[in-house]
Amino acid sequence: MNNNPSLYEKELSFQADRRRAGVEFIKIISDLWYDKSIEMVLFRNQLIDKNVSEILNLHEYAGEFVGKPISIFDSVEIAREMLSLDLPPSKLDIGKLTYEYHLEDDKYHNTKSFVIDKLRKAKESNSIKPKDVVLYGFGRIGRLLARELM
């Protein structure tokens, strides 16, 4: 019998690896959001509270959007580096960062140097000060909408 894995087995293994990467990506996004107040988006698509298949579908959509594949594995690698940095509360587009990483990968010898270079000005920004807001006459839906807009 042939010891080489069949095309089916290779594809099955690849899909399992993608799903594992998706699970790790969700954990990193949750850690960034809940521990560091860093919101991650993928070309303006919310990533928090998404399941693995939604994350993978968003990556496929992002690849179609920019005309170049956006890999979940690259997104995980960049998100992992963001988690290791001390960044202020922010909203970051990991799709844009992953796309730029592919465009400029010859400039950087690893992902960490890319992320540090791209986010170096983040620490220079003014700190966000919380501000209480009272909304009258909006109702429950209006308050939910206002919360999303802030």
What label would you give each PLM region?
Residues 1-129, 148-150:
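N-terminal ligand-binding/catalytic initiation module
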Residues 127-149:
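Glycine-rich adenosine-cofactor-binding loop
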